[in-house]
């Protein structure tokens, strides 16, 4: 069982095979949690800005008790992380707002397809700024995933979806940047950045939102979207970045773009077409093969 305080701490972990396997498990679990966002948003039935505001507000409210519980350690992390924590918060806030807006402009499958670019941008940025090595099998897995992504795009593009996909690409840039920042400062806990991002994104959304229109029947879905889906997924992803390279964590995150349309298909009847399913299967196979090959590498 994963303890919340161990994720909030998120100090640098060892580079053993066991630690890397745990990091991969965290990344996969985070992707599975993130993949539920589309189906949850579909059940809220509020304008995008309202969803963005309440998602941020509930994140701030629910995370605060945990941060206060760990306040001594949190203040140490805040002082140690310095500008990196603020940069992480700004990048996360940008992704929070852009993601909800993208879902309001395009079908879930189209939005998630854009997230397929995340591991490539992350891996390149990590190589340039952190000097992280890219193994040949990881590069091959990324190339195969590009093929799957291209097939999915061919099957999923719809009229009017380009605007949503363009906004989704902002999410990709923000998340890739955050992965690199968190990986760079893996010596400190970056959980406060999630809370601060909620504050920033809530303030950005407030002028465009009408919070008073929310109904009690929508509150459970908002709670599932915010502390459940958003905070839980981010804590797991940040924990994974303490144990595995940023590019590998982002590659495993591709599972989100495959699972997301599946949940919407199963629960809302928004069925992706055959090319989207074929492309998604290729992406899953590439990610799975990369994990398997990583597991066969000598520890160290």
Segments predicted by a language model, with ranges:
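Hydrophobic transmembrane alpha-helices of multi-pass small-molecule transport proteins
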Residues: 2, 63, 92, 134-154, ...
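Hydrophobic/aromatic residues within transmembrane alpha-helices
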Residues: 44, 51, 55, 102, ...
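Hydrophobic alpha-helical transmembrane segments of multi-pass membrane transport proteins
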Residues: 32-36, 40-43, 66, 86-101, ...
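Alpha-helical transmembrane segments of compact multi-pass small-molecule transporters, enriched
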Residues: 58-62, 114-128, 143-144, 199-204, ...
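Glycine-/small-residue-enriched transmembrane alpha-helix faces in small-molecule transporters
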Residues: 2-53, 57, 90, 98, ...
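C-terminal-most transmembrane helix of multi-pass membrane proteins
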Residues: 2-4, 8-13, 56, 154, ...
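Membrane-interface interhelical linkers
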Residues: 1-29, 60-87, 99-100, 130-139, ...
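Loop-to-transmembrane alpha-helix entry segments
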Residues: 79, 112-115, 128-151, 155-165, ...
């Amino acid at each position: 069982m994963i303890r919340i305080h161990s994720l909030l701490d998120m100090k640098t972990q060892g580079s053993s095979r066991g630690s890397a396997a745990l990091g991969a498990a965290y990344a996969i679990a985070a992707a599975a949690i993130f993949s539920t966002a589309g189906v949850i948003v579909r059940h809220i039935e509020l304008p995008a800005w309202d969803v963005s505001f309440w998602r941020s507000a509930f994140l701030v409210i629910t995370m605060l008790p945990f941060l206060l519980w760990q306040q001594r350690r949190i203040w140490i992390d805040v002082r140690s992380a310095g500008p990196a924590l603020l940069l992480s918060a700004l990048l996360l806030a940008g992704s929070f707002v852009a993601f909800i807006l993208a879902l309001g402009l395009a079908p879930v499958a189209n939005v998630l397809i854009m997230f397929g670019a995340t591991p490539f941008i992350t891996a390149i940025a990590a190589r340039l700024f952190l000097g992280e090595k890219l193994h040949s099998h990881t590069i091959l897995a990324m190339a195969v995933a590009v093929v799957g992504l291209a097939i999915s795009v061919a099957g999923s593009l719809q009229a009017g979806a380009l605007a949503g996909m363009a906004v989704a690409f902002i999410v990709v840039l923000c998340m890739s940047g955050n992965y690199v920042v968190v990986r760079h400062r893996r010596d400190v806990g970056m959980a406060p950045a999630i809370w601060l991002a909620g504050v920033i994104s809530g303030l950005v959304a407030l002028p465009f939102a009408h919070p008073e229109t929310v109904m009690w029947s929508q509150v459970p879905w908002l709670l599932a979207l915010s502390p459940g889906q958003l905070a839980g997924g981010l804590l797991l992803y940040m924990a994974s970045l303490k144990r595995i390279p940023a590019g590998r964590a982002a590659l495993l995150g591709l599972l989100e773009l495959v699972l997301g349309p599946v949940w919407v298909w199963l629960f809302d009847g928004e069925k992706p077409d055959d090319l989207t399913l074929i492309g998604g299967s290729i992406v899953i196979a590439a990610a799975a093969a990369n994990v398997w090959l990583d597991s066969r590498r000598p520890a160290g």
